[in-house]
Regions:
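Extracellular carbohydrate-recognition regions
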Residues: 19-38
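Short carbohydrate-recognition loop motifs
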Residues: 46-66
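Extra-cytoplasmic beta-strand recognition segments
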Residues: 26, 73-93, 162
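Extracellular beta-strand ligand-recognition surfaces/modules
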Residues: 106-109, 146, 154-178
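Hydrophobic core
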Residues: 12-16
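Extracellular/lumenal carbohydrate-interaction signature centered on repeated Trp-anchored short motifs
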Residues: 71-82, 101, 151-154, 176
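Extracellular ligand-binding interfaces
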Residues: 89-156
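Sec-dependent signal peptide recognition
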Residues: 2-9
Length: 178
């Protein structure tokens, strides 16, 4: 099964209420700052530009890897909100994302604290089968949570604004005050 997801860089940004922002850049130059995460080379990433700005397209068959970057904890304290825009071209037909066998997402952005196994992670995910706001412990790891931010089936771009700092504090008890 081939799954497509697009992420729009002009809206994949960390912001504050004071309008500071940190953009994740999907231009050719910006792509050099993203590191491949996961095992193998299972996802094809291409970038492009349309009237809304640069975007990242991910294509995967059966399993996927990710792209990532490290940001300082201070940045999350200063800019707790993540604005993410994405469009799902093709979704899963049937899948039970609550189980280990069906634990797969058409699109997700993982945020977390820590670099090694045991890191505290939250997957901000799209699901056509679960309600927005659904939260569960990952069936694969104790330190990872799945949080559904979208179940839109329109095939159009949609944007969500998530307070990542608050979500990490709520799901993992991570303190950002020290």
């Amino acid at each position: 099964m081939r799954i497509f997801a697009y992420f729009l860089s002009s809206l994949l940004i960390f912001t504050t209420v004071n309008s500071k922002e940190f953009r994740i850049d999907f231009s050719d130059e910006g792509m050099k700052t993203l590191k491949k995460r996961g095992f193998g080379k299972k996802t094809l990433y291409t970038n492009g530009k349309d009237d809304k700005g640069w975007y990242l397209k991910a294509e995967a068959n059966d399993s996927a890897t990710g792209l990532g970057m490290e940001i300082e904890k201070d940045l999350l304290e200063e800019m707790p909100f993540l604005n993410i825009s994405f469009k799902i071209e093709r979704d899963f037909d049937v899948i039970d994302q609550k189980t280990k066998d069906g634990h797969d997402w058409t699109a997700r952005v993982m945020v977390g604290h820590g670099k090694k196994i045991g890191a505290k992670l939250v997957s901000l995910a799209h699901s056509s089968f679960l309600e927005e706001g659904f939260l569960q412990q990952s069936p694969w790891t104790k330190g990872s949570r799945d949080y559904v931010i979208s179940n839109d089936k329109s095939g159009e771009w949609h944007t969500r604004k998530i307070n990542v700092k608050e979500l990490l504090e709520k799901t993992h008890g991570i303190s950002f005050t020290n």
